[in-house]
Curated annotation (Swiss-Prot):
It holds the Pfam family IPPT. SUPFAM superfamilies: P-loop containing nucleoside triphosphate hydrolases. It comes from Acaryochloris marina (strain MBIC 11017). It is an enzyme of class 2 (transferase). Monomer. Keywords: ATP-binding, Magnesium, Nucleotide-binding, Transferase, tRNA processing. The record marks 101 as: Interaction with substrate tRNA. Its cofactor is Mg(2+). This is tRNA dimethylallyltransferase. It comes from the Bacteria. Catalyzes the transfer of a dimethylallyl group onto the adenine at position 37 in tRNAs that read codons beginning with uridine, leading to the formation of N6-(dimethylallyl)adenosine (i(6)A).
């Protein structure tokens, strides 16, 4: 067997982590997370982070590697992921990269050449004080291609793109060349074609997160890091924070989270479907594991 990389990607709430665990057990493979929020300690329930039991059962990497006040750039993630993949290859292992952060996956699969601009804390503070609406408008002016790929409410990525532009004078979108890896890669995509069914799953998952103590998690993050923590403005956490501050009801917070998750899944679907190299599978197929396993066995390098 030639060491390579198995990628499991696709929209949120399609069972990517469960499939990765099942395959990792069969292959004796480590799992690398490709989730831009699971890298942060304390953001657990709302990011569907693998449980402690699952992490003890199968080695997971690139989870809980940063404090929420720290900045992990795509270049930082890429560097750490590439180092881990190289390490596993020397041990004869093929790791599994799983997640829904498209840029993280592209950084590895396509070998994106990403500008290594250190975080500019003073600049970030100045930009953040202007509010997300204003800074996103600035991004649309200075780097339209980057703005098209970044959601208008994604403050973390908006700040980073502006940071790169104001530090280097060159738009982030103009600095991303490619240097694809030489090892073989199998990309597996999971999706649910029945959007009503996918919505039901998102509703059930959101309700389960609340029952598991998501509100307590958000309150602890607010108490420890402050209400202005940028990560608390991300999907789900923003809505739960609004409820805790008595701005909306829990029913409204849950409904908004479900709606925004559906919208996020749509954007992920568009992103990943543009990649012709992905082998797609129906996440609701009862024979999913067998079908994916057959695909893996059909790869000459595995």
């Amino acid at each position: 067997m030639t060491p390579g990389l198995i990628v499991i990607c696709g929209p949120t709430a399609t069972g990517k982590s469960s499939l990765a665990l099942a395959l990792a057990r069969r292959l004796g493979a480590p799992i690398l997370s490709a989730d831009s929020r699971q890298v942060y300690r304390g953001f657990d329930i709302g990011t569907a982070k693998p449980s402690v039991t699952d992490q003890e059962d199968v080695p997971h990497y690139l989870i809980d590697i940063c404090d929420p006040t720290e900045t992990l750039t795509v270049a930082d993630y890429q560097e750490q992921a590439q180092a881990l993949i190289a390490q596993f290859h020397t041990e004869g292992q093929t790791p599994i990269l799983v997640g829904g952060t498209g840029l993280y996956i592209r950084a590895i699969v396509e070998g994106l050449k990403i500008p290594r601009v250190p975080p500019q804390l003073e600049l970030r503070s100045q930009l953040q004080s202007q509010g997300q609406v204003q800074i996103y408008q600035w991004l649309q002016q200075v780097d339209p291609p980057a703005a098209q790929k970044i959601h208008a409410h994604d403050q973390v990525r908006t700040l980073r793109a502006l940071e790169v532009f104001y530090t280097t004078g060159i738009p982030l979108s103009a600095q991303q060349g490619k240097n694809p890896p030489s090892y073989p890669i199998l990309q597996i995509g999971l999706d649910i074609s029945d959007l009503d069914q996918h919505t039901d799953i998102i509703q059930q998952r959101t309700a389960a997160m609340v029952e598991q103590g998501w509100l307590t998690e958000v309150q602890k993050l607010i108490d420890h890091y402050g209400v202005e923590l940028p990560l608390l403005a991300t999907l789900g956490y923003q809505e739960m924070k609004a409820y805790l501050h008595q701005q909306i009801t829990l029913e409204e917070a849950t409904a908004q989270t479900i709606l925004h998750t559906r919208q996020f899944a749509k954007r992920q679907r568009t992103w990943f479907r543009a990649n012709s190299g992905i082998h797609w599978f129906d996440a609701t197929n009862s024979d999913l594991l067998s079908l994916v396993w057959k695909d893996i066995q059909g790869q000459p390098w595995l």
